[in-house]
Amino acid sequence: AYPPAENLLVAENIPLDIVFEDETVIVVNKPAGMVVHPGHGNYSGTLVNGLIHHIENLPTNSNERPGLVHRIDKDTSGLLVIAKTEFAMANLSKQFFDRSTERVYYAIVWGSIEEDEGTIEGNIGRSFKNRLQMDVFPEGDFGKPAITHYKVLERLTYVTLVQCKLETGRTHQIRAHFKHIGHTLFNDERYGGNEILKGTTFTKYKQFVQNCFNVLPRQALHAKT
């Protein structure tokens, strides 16, 4: 079957983990593995397909993405706020544009981060070597400005649990920034966070990491707010 036209959205009865809902907004806990909106290669099974089944007449933005004012990566789990009215959409969009919203994530990264807290700054843009990745350009000659504040919550021998607060919202910001400082996200295949096993000869360590990958078979990133 041919995929539907890009602006033809089909309602699908997809179970949604609704955290909060009133007359103006709905907050959904998106599972890892779910794409937020239809696009090339993903024409069904997205969060938007489920939303338009749950709610009629969601407001649309210029990109024909009903209710959406922000998004998170397919393999990132966590909270998304969706506008149910035109007023809410305009208001929320302005808050994201003005950076007055608080966007907090939890991440597990490889290695032990020395500082208890810190800030990662550096422009983020499309990688010249791999177009599926974003790179950090600290000199500011390419990309767009990006700022990530982090705080260590717990050090766990091989990995560190961190809380990240975004001052900007660039594509793959947390993933690219932490790779840049040498602490790739746990099991982040696109940025090499799954390559820790390659060349490892310590069998017990190798088995431990493989067990961890089995428990969390995707990048360790969750949108808390």
For each feature predicted by the language model, list its residue ranges.
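RNA pseudouridine synthases
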Residues: 1-129
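Intrinsically disordered, low-complexity segments enriched in polar/charged residues with Gly/Pro
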Residues: 3-6, 12-13, 110-111, 137-140, ...
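Short, basic/low-complexity N-terminal boundary segments at the transition from targeting/disordered tails
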Residues: 4, 131, 203-207
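The conserved catalytic core of RNA pseudouridine synthases
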Residues: 62-94, 101-102, 106, 125-183, ...
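Charge-rich, low-complexity amphipathic helices
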Residues: 73, 114, 142, 172, ...
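Phosphate/ribose-recognition catalytic cores of enzymes acting on nucleotide-derived substrates
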Residues: 179-225
